């Protein structure tokens, strides 16, 4: 019976048909993650807007000239025209205050306004707007109103924390002679309602009109049932991890073990609205929201009179114009074989990012090709005094009987050690090798090598994810291996339980099998621990660093956690070489 329970538990997680039940709403939220105060500007959790760039885990403003040149002219509230929407948003990001007004050129009479009517205070009421090319003001339809639109409207009115999720505007019997209202759709992170899409609808009375109460510090004192947003706003704990951006800064949706209702849970711990699933735009940084979308039915939009340009479509178009980096995708399909120590021989093309670092004694360490002329490896593998003696061997699967027609051998121009590398503790055990360029060539040519992608976020992969370690190391009986080996290992959450205070969680990653059957060993150092995302794109998640008793249970391998060094790597090799997103 016990074996049956274990088997069912395995099926539950492997086939993902079991739902996790949490005893309380608080159990949905990851407390350790909350302490990091992630928001919509945390590019470790979400993608930056196309007018932003990711630096040290935060989305910061681009300079206008860094935007794509193609686009349509837009007008800002200061009466200035911009060549593209991206340039206008970039300048607004740098100098908040001047907002988007309309798509197209500026006109003298062009004006957009939003106001609240029939409220007792200036923070509540029925929402009324005047569109740029309309002569009269109109109310917003209730049917289209959600927290997305409410937060944007309040932000537009100067309430920095958006809409109040607890309070409701109390409508009395009103006499409103209006047969039409405006349907509005926002993504939720706009800074003005003018950026949202408006269409015209018919209305039957004031009950069909949208109202809002904007959040103020005069709200009720918080209790234990409240969730505190990073921006200081309090919402009900029940509203966390439901796929709805109640906070306005998205902080209630970024540290979730699971999601409520029909919202979609990203592996990175983010909850997104169900309508973002299979909508043609990747919202999860791990990409799984756009996987398995064959036959996925999209919701047909009702035919109505569209009054404003779709600036969200323009945002998506700008994203499509950003530079694309090719990495982590092999030319041939990887063939999984029965499950380095306990590993299997690699075939040509299995590991096109793997390189061997050779000195006078042979291949002593592995490395990872990350693009251009750059190899990533472990600092403990190298000696600065031997820089010009090292060779980089690519497409090697057997270094006793190498295929000379396929192998490319490159020489090393310089080595960059991490400035805080500690040889005693293996902290910051990471280094870069720049290969020499041939003659007057601007770049290195490695025709059969494919760079592995460099991860920018520590949330791309999670404990228990299956990854691949490879190298020319020794077997557990210390027997030398001459052919490239690979094996599947699982990421392990925290190796302090195995290695005590010698394991530094921020800088190191653990991986192995619980029985020790597959492990990195002596000679594998500097080589890759690679993981694949939902789209089968390969990332170098770790660099083989150290461990004890290789191939033994409870002694998993320890790797340098590459995501922790994204900014260090990009500083030396150039951000365009390794940035897939947020550029």
Swiss-Prot record:
Tissue spec. comment: Plasma.
Segments forming domain SRCR: 114-212
Organism the protein comes from: Pongo abelii
Occurrences of domain LDL-receptor class A (ranges): 213-257, 258-294
Function: Responsible for cleaving the alpha-chains of C4b and C3b in the presence of the cofactors C4-binding protein and factor H respectively.
Main location: secreted
Signal peptide: 1-18
Family annotation (CDD domains): LDLa, Tryp_SPc
Name this protein carries in UniProt: Complement factor I
């Amino acid at each position: 019976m016990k074996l049956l329970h274990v088997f069912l538990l395995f099926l539950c997680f492997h086939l993902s048909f079991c739902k996790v039940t949490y005893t309380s709403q608080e159990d949905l939220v990851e407390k350790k993650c909350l302490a990091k105060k992630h928001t919509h500007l945390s590019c470790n959790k979400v993608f930056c807007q196309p007018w932003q760039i990711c630096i040290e885990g935060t989305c910061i403003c681009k300079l206008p000239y860094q935007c794509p040149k193609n686009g349509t002219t837009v007008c800002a509230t200061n009466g200035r025209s911009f060549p593209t929407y991206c340039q206008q948003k970039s300048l607004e990001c740098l100098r908040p205050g001047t907002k988007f007004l309309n798509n197209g050129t500026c006109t003298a009479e062009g004006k957009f306004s939003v106001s609240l009517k029939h409220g007792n205070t200036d923070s509540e009421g029925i929402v009324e707007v005047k569109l740029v090319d309309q002569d009269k003001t109109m109310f917003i339809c209730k049917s289209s109103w959600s927290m997305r639109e409410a937060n944007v409207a309040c932000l537009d009115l100067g309430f920095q924390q958006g809409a109040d999720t607890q309070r409701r505007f109390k409508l009395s019997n009103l006499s409103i002679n209006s047969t039409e209202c405006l349907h509005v759709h926002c993504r939720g992170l706009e800074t003005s309602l003018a950026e949202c899409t408006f269409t015209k609808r018919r209305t039957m009375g004031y009950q069909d009109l949208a109202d809002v109460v904007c959040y103020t510090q005069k709200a009720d004192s918080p209790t234990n049932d409240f969730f505190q947003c990073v921006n200081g706003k309090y919402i009900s704990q029940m509203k966390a991890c439901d796929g709805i951006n109640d906070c306005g800064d998205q902080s209630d949706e970024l540290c979730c073990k699971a999601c409520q209702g029909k919202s979609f849970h990203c592996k990175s711990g983010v909850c997104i609205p169900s309508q973002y699933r299979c909508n043609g735009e990747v919202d999860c940084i791990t990409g799984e929201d756009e996987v398995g979308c064959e036959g996925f039915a999209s919701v047909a939009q009702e035919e109505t009179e569209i009054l404003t340009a779709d600036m969200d479509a323009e945002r998506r178009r700008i994203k499509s114009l950003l530079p694309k980096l090719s990495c982590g995708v092999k030319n041939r399909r990887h063939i999984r074989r029965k499950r380095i120590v306990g590993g299997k021989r690699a075939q040509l093309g299995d590991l096109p990012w793997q390189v061997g670092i050779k000195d006078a004694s042979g291949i002593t360490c592995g490395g990872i090709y990350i693009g251009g002329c750059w190899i990533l490896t472990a600092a403990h593998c190298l000696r600065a005094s031997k820089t010009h003696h090292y060779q980089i061997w690519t497409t090697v699967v057997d270094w006793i009987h190498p295929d000379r027609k396929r192998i490319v051998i490159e020489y090393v121009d310089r080595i960059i050690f991490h400035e805080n590398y500690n040889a005693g503790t293996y902290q910051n055990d990471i280094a870069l090798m720049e290969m020499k360029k041939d003659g007057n060539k601007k770049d290195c040519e490695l025709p059969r090598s494919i760079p592995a992608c460099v991860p920018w976020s520590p949330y791309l992969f999670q404990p228990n994810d299956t990854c691949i370690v490879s190298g020319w190391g020794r077997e557990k009986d210390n027997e030398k291996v001459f052919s490239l080996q690979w094996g599947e290992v699982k990421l392990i959450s925290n190796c302090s339980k195995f290695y005590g205070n010698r394991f530094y969680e921020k800088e190191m990653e653990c991986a192995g099998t619980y029985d020790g059957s597959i492990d990195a060993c002596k000679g594998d150092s500097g080589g890759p621990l690679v993981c694949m995302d939902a789209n089968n794109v390969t990332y170098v998640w770790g660099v083989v660093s150290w461990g004890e008793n290789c191939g033994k249970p409870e002694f998993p391998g320890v790797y340098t956690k590459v995501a922790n060094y994204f900014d260090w790597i990009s500083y030396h090799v150039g951000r365009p070489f390794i940035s897939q997103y947020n550029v």
